[in-house]
UniProtKB/Swiss-Prot annotation:
Biased amino acid composition, Polar residues: 1-20
A biological-process GO annotation: meiotic cell cycle
Keyword Calcium recorded: no
Keyword Oxidoreductase: no
MF-aspect GO terms: protein serine/threonine kinase inhibitor activity
Keywords associated with the record: Meiosis, Sporulation
Biased composition (Low complexity): 21-46
Biological role: Acts as a critical meiotic inducer by binding non-covalently to protein kinase ran1/pat1 inhibiting its enzymatic activity. Inhibits ran1/pat1 by acting as a pseudosubstrate for ran1/pat1 instead of its natural substrate ste11. Inactivation of the ran1/pat1 protein kinase is both necessary and sufficient to divert a vegetative cell from mitotic division to meiotic differentiation.
The organism's place on the tree of life at top rank: Eukaryota
Region (Disordered): 1-96
Record protein name field: Meiosis inducing protein mei3
Length: 148
């Protein structure tokens, strides 16, 4: 209660006639609730607006908001490090995959024949008794259609 009296003497514009709630709080202070001996302490709270400015205000134990001296505006600390979200990381990986796919589209991919393909190729040639010169003996060229 002494802090309220000193705040009124510091600010002549905030008189009892301008603020009728001040007189009501003086009446409440004489109620038996505050006579239990518990002191009302002020707690500082920080609020941040959309521009990133921090405002510090004080709230008493009874729930009333009071000024803590003057309201400070402290800009938030901005970090220089860019943190990637998982969505950005996935997009970046997709871009890399697309670039590698384009490289594979330009170069022809040599297909490796499985053992079953080799045996099928040999049995068909053996069935028709096709004479094979040494140039056509390589099956991979015929499968990849490079010699035709």
């Amino acid at each position: 209660m002494s802090s309220q009296n000193t705040s009124n003497s510091r600010h002549p514009a905030s008189s009892a006639s301008a603020l009728p709630n001040r007189t009501n709080t003086a009446r409440r202070s004489t109620s038996p609730r505050t006579s239990t001996g518990s002191s009302s302490t002020n707690t500082n709270t920080k609020t941040v607006d959309h521009a990133g400015t921090t405002f510090i205000s004080s709230t008493s134990k009874r729930g009333r908001s009071t000024k803590a001296g003057s309201v400070h505006s402290v800009p938030m600390k901005r970090t220089k490090r860019v943190r990637r979200t998982p969505a950005q990381r996935i997009e970046h990986e997709n871009k890399e995959n697309i670039q590698t796919e384009k490289v594979y589209r330009i170069k022809p991919v040599q297909r490796v024949l499985s053992p079953s393909d080799l045996t099928n190729e040999l049995t068909i040639l053996d069935l028709f008794h096709v004479p094979r010169p040494n140039e056509t003996f390589d099956i991979t060229d015929r499968v990849n259609n490079t010699s035709r």
